[in-house]
């Protein structure tokens, strides 16, 4: 049950990922064999639920790619369910301050360190109590990544970085650029300056900086600055643009798409 993704971040080994938005175990398994270090199963902006997350975790399990799951909110009940079906690494959205980061960590820990409910006899995570001493080992294998996506969160970053149990901080460029007044333009110089400063600050604090960006030049720039978990594409975008390009080569008139974060 060792969390190899958490171990890689702790060792300072950059992890390259892909975002999964199709909410399909079939496509998740297809992409699990593509060679990415991690795959993000998105529960915030897709029609995923606990059941569909479970089937994607099962589909990815035989492959080297490590799953990361984003719940729809920093909700301890939802987090408990996601952990019980086998999630070990969580990306918690819209964390604004240290108290919210602390709540996210507590939701992943069994008492007395946290508030995770004990239901291991019902849980895939413990292999239905077939993993020896699961309740004693589980806390140490949980990896908590929190998202900062607003100016308020950026202001509170030093305090968030001080929270014990936060393994990494993920910068959300789409929401951050919108909050800064540049919606749809994460490449604006002010947004980029904030992102770069945050990456350096997170790494200097001994935490893992992360981000999603489909621009390869920017992705490489963030890695150079010290980012440790970088998603470089989204399955929905890859499929849509490839299909449009193929159709266009045979004369189809595709709808113009403005380049964005993904």
From Swiss-Prot:
It is an enzyme of class 4 (lyase). The active site is at residue 45. GO terms for cellular component: cytoplasm. Keywords: Aromatic hydrocarbons catabolism, Lyase, Metal-binding. Substrate binds at residues 147, 174-175. GO terms for molecular function: 4-hydroxy-2-ketopimelate aldolase activity; metal ion binding. GO terms for biological process: 4-hydroxyphenylacetate catabolic process; phenylacetate catabolic process. InterPro entries: Aldolase/citrate-lyase_domain, HKHD_aldolase_ent, HpaI, HpcH-HpaI_aldolase, Pyrv/PenolPyrv_kinase-like_dom, Pyrv_kinase-like_dom_sf. The record marks 84 as: Increases basicity of active site His. The record marks 70 as: Transition state stabilizer. It catalyses: 4-hydroxy-2-oxoheptanedioate = succinate semialdehyde + pyruvate. It holds the Pfam family HpcH_HpaI. A divalent metal cation binds at residues 149, 175. Binds 1 divalent metal cation per subunit. Pathway: Aromatic compound metabolism; 4-hydroxyphenylacetate degradation; pyruvate and succinate semialdehyde from 4-hydroxyphenylacetate: step 7/7. Its EC number is 4.1.2.52. Its cofactor is a divalent metal cation. Catalyzes the reversible retro-aldol cleavage of 4-hydroxy-2-ketoheptane-1,7-dioate (HKHD) to pyruvate and succinic semialdehyde. Homohexamer; trimer of dimers. Belongs to the HpcH/HpaI aldolase family. NCBIfam families: HpaI. PANTHER family: 2-KETO-3-DEOXY-L-RHAMNONATE ALDOLASE, PHOSPHOENOLPYRUVATE CARBOXYLASE FAMILY PROTEIN. This is 4-hydroxy-2-oxo-heptane-1,7-dioate aldolase.
